[in-house]
C-alpha cells in the first residue's frame, strides 16, 4: 500500500507539471493570436491580397494550436481526482445473448411482504395529475420507512405486512385557487369558532335553554377570571348581624362567606338574583376601623334593568272575589 501511494504521488506531480505546461502553451498561443489580430486591425494601408491571405492562414494556425492546447488541459483535468487503481482487463463476453443479460431474480410471494397501499378517491377537477409529487426517506420515531405519494392519490408504505386499502372521501372543492385546509387546520378553525360561540354565549343578555344555553353540551370557555369593573361604597349597617345588609335596587343571594385576616368579621359574597344568568356580584364586609359601617364592593355590570326583578318570578294571581249571597 505504501509503494502504491508513492507511485500515485509521483504520478500526480507529473500530471500537474503537464497541465501547467499545456496551460502555459495555450496562454502563449492566445497572446500571439491577440497580437496578430491587433497588428492586422491597426495597419494603415490596405495590405496586398497575398499578404492578407498569409495573415489569415497564420491566424488560423495560431487559433488551432491554442484550441488544441486547451483541449489537452481539459482532458488532463478530467483524468485527475479519480481512483488510484487501474482498470482490470475487460472480460470477454460470451456469444449467447442470454448469458450476457442477468436473469431477473424472482421471489416467492411469501418471501417478500407486500407494502400497505392507501387508495384515495380522485380529487375534484381543480386537482388533477398536475399535482403529482413523491416523498421518500421519511423516518418515524420507532422505525424508518419509505413512502411515495403518486399523482392519482395512492400512498405506498414500505413496511412489511399484508396488503390493505382504505378509501377516503375526496377533498373539498376550492375557489379562487386556494388550497383546502388540512385536518389539523380545520380542527383549529372549528375550535376557534366554538370558543367564540362560547364567549358570546357567556356574555349574552338572554340565556335560554338551561345552564349552558342551546350549544348542545358543556361550555369549553376558559375558567380564568376576567377583569371586572369594581366599585366600592360605604353604607351604615342596619343591625349587628352579619347577614343583615342594606337593600338596594336589585335582589341578591348569598353564595359564600370567607374570613378576613386581621378582622373578626367575615366577608359575605352575593350574586344578583334579579334575572337568571346576570354576571353582577358583590361582597360585603364590616369596616375594621368602624364596625358600624359596611364596605360594599360591586363587581361586573348588570345585564338588565332594575324593573326586570319581577320578570323571572311573576307575581301570583289575586284571589277570586267573594260574591255576596242573594
Swiss-Prot record:
Biased composition (Low complexity): 97-113
Gene3D superfamilies the UniProt entry points to: WRKY domain
Residue ranges flagged as DNA-binding region: 241-307
UniProt region (Disordered), positions on chain: 87-113, 204-225, 297-326
Principal cellular location given in the protein's record: nucleus
Composition bias type Pro residues, residue spans: 314-326
Sorted UniProt keywords: DNA-binding, Nucleus, Transcription, Transcription regulation
GO biological process: negative regulation of gibberellic acid mediated signaling pathway; response to abscisic acid; response to gibberellin
Record has Transcription as a keyword: yes
GO CC annotations on file: nucleus
SUPFAM superfamilies recorded: WRKY DNA-binding domain (SSF118290)
Tissue-wise expression: Highly expressed in aleurone cells. In seeds, predominantly present in the plumule, radicle and scutellum of the embryo.
One Gene Ontology term of the molecular function aspect: promoter-specific chromatin binding
InterPro entries tied to this protein: WRKY_dom, WRKY_dom_sf, WRKY_plant, Zn-cluster-dom
Keyword Transcription on entry: yes
Induction: Induced by abscisic acid (ABA) in aleurone cells. Accumulates in response to uniconazole, a gibberellic acid (GA) biosynthesis inhibitor. Repressed by GA.
Location in the cell: Nucleus
Residue window of motif Nuclear localization signal: 70-77
Pfam families: Plant_zn_clust, WRKY
Record note on domains: The WRKY domain is required to bind DNA.
Record family assignment: Belongs to the WRKY group II-a family.
Role summary: Transcription factor. Interacts, when in complex with WRKY71, specifically with the W box (5'-(T)TGAC[CT]-3'), a frequently occurring elicitor-responsive cis-acting element. Represses specifically gibberellic acid (GA)-induced promoters in aleurone cells, probably by interfering with GAM1.
Protein name: WRKY transcription factor WRKY51
